[in-house]
Regions:
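Solvent-exposed interaction patches of small proteins and small membrane subunits
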Residues: 1-156
Length: 156
């Protein structure tokens, strides 16, 4: 499938991987404790990079579904439904995301909710699984999408 829209998918995937890789670095750098400006910047930088990374991942998945003529999920739980659907084969297309990548995406989705709704109660120890999931996605998402693309369009 030589559809030029793959360029935007690839940009979204690269953005997701880049933001999530930086999230891992930011989490490792720490400095979250305290009420001073540096602690505030550390917390906000980590939460925003996680939010940006996951949002870029969702954008890539929606673009892929658009390319395939598949309607993306709608409704209150569309964010979770998007990952669940991408993790399974539907209507002749293979799963877009392998199980481990989908599991990590669910974790970053969960954390994005924290970043968007509960940022005042950020607890670094509770973010450890999310930072680990960000590492899984940063390392594995680009290859997972490339494998999917080759699977549906070996000549593309």
């Amino acid at each position: 499938m030589s559809d030029a829209r793959w360029a935007e998918v690839e940009e979204d995937v690269a953005a997701a991987a880049g933001h999530l890789a930086r999230s891992v670095e930011l989490f490792g750098a720490g400095g979250f404790a305290g009420e001073g400006l540096e602690a505030y910047k550390a917390r906000m930088a980590f939460m925003h990079s996680m939010q940006s990374g996951h949002t870029s991942l969702e954008s890539a998945l929606v673009r892929i579904m658009d390319l395939l003529g598949e309607e993306p999920p709608i409704g209150r739980d569309w964010h979770a439904d998007l990952i669940r659907r991408a993790a399974r084969a539907i209507g002749g297309r293979p799963a877009i995301l392998p199980a481990g990548i989908a599991e990590a995406a669910h974790e970053t989705r969960r954390f994005r909710h924290v970043a968007m709704r509960s940022y005042g109660t950020f607890e670094p120890t509770r973010a450890e699984p999310s930072a680990a999931a960000a590492g899984v996605l940063a390392a594995g998402l680009p290859d997972a999408i490339a494998v999917f693309r080759r699977g549906i369009d070996p000549d593309g």
